[in-house]
Every structure is written in C-alpha cells, then in structure tokens.
Swiss-Prot record:
The chain crosses the membrane at residues 119-139. Interacts with IL1R1, IRAK1, TLR4, TLR5, TLR9 and TRAF6. Upon IL-1 stimulation found in a complex at least composed of IL1R1, SIGIRR, MYD88, IRAK1 and TRAF6. Upon stimulation with LPC found in a complex at least composed of TLR4, SIG1IR, MYD88, IRAK1 and TRAF6. Interacts with PALM3. Pfam families: Ig_2, TIR. It comes from Rattus norvegicus. This is Single Ig IL-1-related receptor. Coiled coil: none annotated. The lineage of its organism: Eukaryota, Metazoa, Chordata, Craniata, Vertebrata.
C-alpha cells in the first residue's frame, strides 16, 4: 500500500515553474494547487513552502491558507496560498511548493526595475512633432489654402452694377501718392487684375464732396483706406473717427485699413485703437518693409479681403470675321468697276452689312460671270500689307466693323 500512497501528485497550479516581477511594496499571493491520490490508509496530504531552500511557516510576514477537496476515485485536491508583502529586497527569491516532498513547482520572484517610460516618452515626442508640423504647415500654407478656396468656391461678385473692385482713399502727401501709384496700384491692377478707383484720378466733375463720395463708394465693391501718419493727422480722424467708421460700415462691406509698422509705437493713435477693438467688422492689414515682395503675406491677405477674380478665356476669332475666312473686312477695298463689283461679291458675301445679302434689283442687268477670279493686285493695286491677318486678335472688336473704300485709302 505504500506504493499506492507514493504516487506523484499532479500540479494544477502552477502547471510549470513561473517567474514573476512584482514591484517593491506590493502584496503577493502565490497559489499552489495539486491533485493527489489518496486512500484511507494514506497520510493526510500537505503542501510545504520553501524560500531559497528554507522552509516557511505562518508568521508575521508570511501567511498560509490551506484547503482540501475530496473527489471520487480516491483522489483529493489540496490547495495552499502563500500571502506576503514585498517590503524589502530580501523578500525576493525562489518560492517552492512541494506535495508530500515528492513533487514540487516553484515561483521565482525577481525585482522589477523602474517602470519603463521609453515608449510613452517616444509617443509623446512623436505627437509633439506632428503637432509642430501641423502648426508650421498652418502658418506657412494657411493663406495659400484660403486663396485656393476663394478662387475655386468663393462668391463671384459680378453683375452687381459695380464698376470698380476697390475704392482707394489716401492723403495727398507725396509719400502716400508714391505708395499708392508705384506699389499698391501696379500690384493690384497689373499683376492681379483688379480695377481700382483712386481718389485723385476718377472723381466726377462738378460734384459735391458728400454726394461724390456716396456715388464713388456705390460704384466700388470694397473700400481701401491707407492710414498713413498724414492721413491720421486729418481733423476728422482725431475728433470724429468713431462716427466716420460707423458711417463707412453702413456704406461699404467690411472696409480695409492699411496701417504701417512705425505706427505701433506708443502712444497709439485713438483711431488705430478703435480699429483694433472692431477687428470683427473691418480688415486691418499691417505694411512691413518686407511686404513689398509680391509673394508676401500682405498681398495674400489683401487679396482675400478683395472680391474673387474670375479669369475668362479669350474667344478665338471674331464672329464678324468667321464668314470672311478670318480676313479683316476693314481692309477690304471696294472697287467701282464691274470687275470690282464682282470682286466685292466674291470677297464679301454680305456687302450690305448686317441686313443680309442684297438680291437683284428689278430692271438691273445681271452681273456677268467671269471665268477667272480677279485678284486685288491685278485691277486695283493696294499698298496694304495683309500678310499678318491670320495672326491678328479680333477679340476686342466685337461691336461693329466698317468697310474701307478705295477713296479712303
């Protein structure tokens, strides 16, 4: 019977040796459960704990809880739980549980180092780099993206009865005239295709100042005010600028004010302070020494504040010259002879203009037919050079045309 009682237990937990790395100061519970073969004549099964080869028992530092469950077929399950706190480095080691001193499994506790924050630090740095790149792209490409959106999906302000894109108001000082005529106007009109109304150029004759201002503003889609030092020295800028600003907001849509970098010094002009307080109602732009570059942010912000420009593709050919085989009817010489009349009917199928082809007149002899075509150089010599007619652009002349006679030549 002794051989029956010496059968090797089967460990259910742990199924194999384990290595654990709990942190210092944590509580540890090691569970050792085994299935043993038992007979009435066999001794009571038990589980023994050892630490680094030394036996452990219940004490102030270690606590043991042992349970038994009897099953069929003369088998029994025994479980022992070792509970303790890792308070010092000596508490780490190899803990072995054995059943009947026949079979054993072990728990190896090793001290885990400080929590690894490398992955968290790398992830944080990656997120920070991504945010910096997004912020950099926003700063560098924000205006370009807004311009693309305006040119693609922006509101087209056409057929509104306006003749100009912007009304430019500035003082009559020489430096302001130079800024408007040599910097602002060339950049907006020539490079970007806007049409400006300058205060000293297209004024209505013999008009009252107040009525003239109302008429001019009604003809323009935007208002640009060059707030130079000379402009700010005007009496109304210091005394009644608030009333004037309220009036402008009623007359025009979101006026544009151009300020200069030298005006940022203290004390700030009351008009500039008022404009900064109402940024949500006006467009306030700052001119810097580097703004003269065509690709600077100043021009992009100004273009965003101005109406969207629509580019039209030029029409190829003039409807009035398509019937003439792309020949300019203004250069066709009309003759007086019969041959000239025949030449006229051949070169111009519509000699009476837009009224249609003239039919035969009652009583008029029919026009003789000629076997050979008469060229211009045979009957009536012309000194005009018509070799470049095919390369001319007729898109600008779409309203009317006239025929040039030989006498006019």
């Amino acid at each position: 019977m002794a051989g029956v009682c010496d059968r090797v237990p089967n460990f259910l937990s742990p199924s194999e040796d384990q290595a654990l790395g709990p942190a210092l100061g944590s509580a540890v519970a090691l569970n050792c459960t085994a299935w043993v073969f038992s007979r009435p004549q066999c001794p009571q099964p038990s589980v023994q704990w050892l630490k680094d080869g030394l036996a452990l028992g219940n004490g102030s530092h270690f606590s043991l809880h042992q349970d038994f469950w009897v099953s069929d077929n003369f088998s029994e399950i025994v479980s022992s739980v070792l509970v303790f706190n890792l308070t010092k480095a000596e508490d780490y080691g190899t803990f072995t549980c054995s059943a009947w001193n026949v079979s054993s499994h072990s728990f190896t506790l090793w001290r885990a180092g400080p929590a690894g924050h490398v992955a968290a630090v790398l992830a944080s740095l990656l997120v920070l780099v991504v945010l910096l790149l997004v912020a950099l792209l926003y700063v560098k490409c924000r205006l370009n993206v807004l311009l693309w959106y305006q040119d693609t999906y922006g509101e087209v302000e056409m057929n509104d009865g306006k003749l100009y894109d912007a009304y430019v108001s500035y003082s009559d000082r020489p430096e302001d005239r130079k800024f408007v005529n040599f910097i602002l106007k060339p950049q907006l009109e020539r490079r970007r295709g806007y049409k400006l109304f300058l205060e000293d150029r297209d004024l209505l004759p013999r008009a009252e100042p107040s009525a003239d201002l109302l008429v001019n503003l009604s003809r323009c889609r935007r208002l640009i005010v060059v707030l130079s030092d000379a402009f700010l020295r005007r009496p109304w800028c210091s005394q009644s600028f608030r009333e004037g600003l309220c009036r402008l907001l009623e007359l025009t849509r979101r006026p544009i004010f151009i300020t200069f970098e030298g005006q940022r010094r203290e004390p700030i002009h009351p008009a500039l302070r008022l404009l900064r307080q109402h940024r949500h109602l006006v467009t306030l732009l700052l001119w810097k020494p580097g703004s003269v570059t065509p690709s600077s942010d100043f021009w992009k912000e100004l273009q965003l504040a101005l109406p969207r420009k629509v580019q039209y593709r030029p029409v190829e050919g003039d409807p009035q010259t398509r019937l003439q085989d792309d020949k300019d009817p203004m250069l066709i010489v009309r003759g007086r002879a019969a041959q000239g009349r025949a030449m006229e009917s051949e070169l111009d199928p519509d000699p009476e203009g837009d009224l249609g082809v003239r039919g035969p007149v009652f009583g008029e002899p029919p026009t003789p037919l000629h076997e050979s075509k008469v060229s211009i150089g045979e009957g009536h010599a012309s000194e005009m050079d018509v070799s470049d007619l095919g390369s001319r652009n007729y898109s600008a002349r779409t309203d009317f045309y006239c025929l040039v006679s030989e006498d006019d030549v």
